């Protein structure tokens, strides 16, 4: 299964089990860019996105954009000066961790420090040819910069060359939670409680920042060297400005809340629906609403009750049913920080969780990844780690009339370097996998 999901569809991912799917730095203002051809004329312009205003799509539904002062502009402000820009040549590729329609993810070693990172590569041409590719890329880049949480994957650098964007992310040597689930088929309730508790803290943090995650599933839950959760892939995440509802028809179908499938306005409550699906999946080995076609899956999600197996305990059964309320206002967690979050934490399935210690990473994880050589990516699928490292040239013919790298304003300001304190202290304390 994929390590990082590059969503290649503007709407739903069509397959729940689909596989993810010159190095000189180029000055961001130094491109000779041409206009997009008519075939890509529907792409939202950067000027439409940067002011954070609401816009309507072709169906008349409202889209809410990430509030930013400019395309990919750092929240540090105009006075923020990166301590040292990176470029592809600064990193040695070691192995492939995942791939998709937008690009791929590599395990890389920073040449001057020896530190290991996950390098997410995104092909510019693929991004601009998708109607929402620019918006999703901007959202992911902006959110990753803003978020600081022990159970959310960190962004350390962002840069670009002529053909690609690069995100240098925290490497999670424990691999996907999905891989551990696939190996064991079903996870014990105490294990499920621990990891969904860590995910709950991550989601609460995002919701307090006004971010709706929208793609919670085992493939997007990684394990660090100690076995703690790292939530990753924010390509479908959205900042709902001033508490406004979202309307985009996105997500992974089996994990989508009814209100998304029915194209109704929705908010952070969709993430708690996905949490209920995730708990069911981890306990039983599959999501509750499955079928061999999209229409049947949609009918089950919007109309049917989950068929919970007899061996699921009463506590787990109760929280699943409370998360999977069709009416989002009745859903556990929907009340937000005042009541909803406390109600989740006080549920009996989490009775053994000390939430203060959990957030400080003081509770031992139930799964400790076997890591004999962090550079070998032992906990990732051999389907990807066996792939060649060579970068495939991007051909003009591959994208019709679109000239590669012909859209300067769209990617202006993408570069990012985390503060020295964050790079050194955070990395050494939480991600020193080479000493594991």
Swiss-Prot record:
The active site is at 215 (proton acceptor). Gene3D superfamilies: Phosphorylase Kinase, domain 1, Transferase(Phosphotransferase) domain 1. The modification Phosphotyrosine is found at residue 102. One of its GO terms (molecular function) is ribosomal protein S6 kinase activity. InterPro entries: AGC-kinase_C, Kinase-like_dom_sf, Prot_kinase_dom, Ser/Thr_kinase_AS, STKc_AGC. The modification Phosphothreonine is found at residues 392, 415. Phosphorylation at Tyr-102 inactivates the enzyme. Residues 91-350 form the Protein kinase domain. It is found in: Cytoplasm. Pfam families: Pkinase. SUPFAM superfamilies: Protein kinase-like (PK-like). ATP binds at residues 97-105, 120. Belongs to the protein kinase superfamily. AGC Ser/Thr protein kinase family. S6 kinase subfamily. This is Serine/threonine-protein kinase psk1.
